[in-house]
Amino acid sequence: MKWRAPGAALAGIIAVAAVLRFSLLGQNSLWFDEAWMAWIGQQRWQDIVPLLAAGDAHPPLSYFLMKAWIGIAGDGESALRFLSACCSVLSVALTYALARRVSTAPVGLLSAFVVGVSPFAVMAGQDARMYALLGTLALASTLALVACCERGGVLRWGGYVLLAAATIYTHYFGGLVILAHGIWVAWYERPHLAPWLLAMGGVASLYLPWAPSLWHQIANENGWPWYRRGAFVLHPGDLLGLMAFGGSLFGMGSYFFPGTVGPAGQVLILLPFLVTLWRGAASWMSDRRSLALVGLPFVVTGVATASASFARVLIFYPRWFSFLLPFYAVLLARGLEDIAGRWQGRRGEALALLTAGLLAFGVPVLDRYYFDPGFRPYPWRAAADLVRREGRPGDFLLFVNGSAEIAFTYYFREPHPSLALTPVEAAEGADRDPAFTGIQARALAKRYRRLWIIATVPFTPDQMERLRSRLEQVYQAVGARIYPGIWVHLLEARRAASR
């Protein structure tokens, strides 16, 4: 197979990637994390850092960008997701650039194609969060580091400092990417270790203003709230399934939820991908510098997060790791090329057939993602429409937690009396007062004949029972609607309680 016009092929791949990411961008309802992003972006500039320090577990760059973007494009669903879609498309081009640094044009194009049509990349690219931006910056900083080591220069190192700092200012996982860079430099580019350490001094100085807020996040335990403590939620099989074909099939985990198939079943499902990755790594053993450049971000991130998860210090959701997909894609493409090369004389046809076979897994996932209304949980738009349609003036809205309030009120902006409960599990110490008492319930029943309960995860059976016991004496249920991840109940005050 002749690769005479890689530029034209790359342009076509980027065009396909753009269509996949910008199509139906506002179709799905925002879920809580996106609504939180929008809510932070609607606050005053000077309030963003204190809000993140008090109630978030991420650094501020993506929130500042969202704040600026909302001022330009508004806070509609498509507008909120536009920046992620742009970053996701840019990552396709950067994946090609990285692959070409370490391999051939076919591997570069195939890597870009894998990322371009990946359901996992599409989902992250249509998520108004920081994951797509992190992926772009991880690739850009890696390319900048290679340029620094190969050609040097103050300007190139300065550019690397800015990109590395931006990576860590986007997500704390960015620090693991930069750590992988340091290991690579120390092992394979020892003459450039001193300049890299000097660059890290520059990154540290740029990061210093955020240090007090980072300390507050750690002290407040923002990264491990009550409903995550003691849980083990790092599922390598689900993560690899998402990278391989978008998960969601054969009992594999999805973008939001863990899977139901056991480890043996996961290995069987993922076996073709595992073999291809193994061949990719094996074919690179003669150029371990390139293999390490591509593989270390994956290895360092995996070891660090697995260690923290096994120790039950932190938990991690597979969707957080979408920034590693380009590195996976390069290794997969290298493996496909190696396997196809064994068909002498028919290498091009074999490569096309193998690629189509592996990527065909993702077609039904994309079909469900775009066209199955039940594929994505947390339809807050539908929940708000229900209350808007059936609600009456003066109805009281009772949110079981702040997550429900922020996500629901993104869509439901009509003024209504409301209360957001704080679970007692979120309070520290043994003497934790109940967030909602029977006295409060009776007071509500006297003032508000109708009450809507709007609930979302985390909403444990204990919380349900506590809330039921407070309300059942003064209210009776008259209606309910269950959505994926959302519960909406309508209650009316009993006659005796409303007097």
Which stretches of residues belong to each language-model region?
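Membrane-proximal helix-loop-helix interfaces that form the catalytic/acceptor-binding platform
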Residues: 6-497
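Short, Lys/Arg-rich, polar N-terminal cytosolic tail immediately upstream
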Residues: 1-3
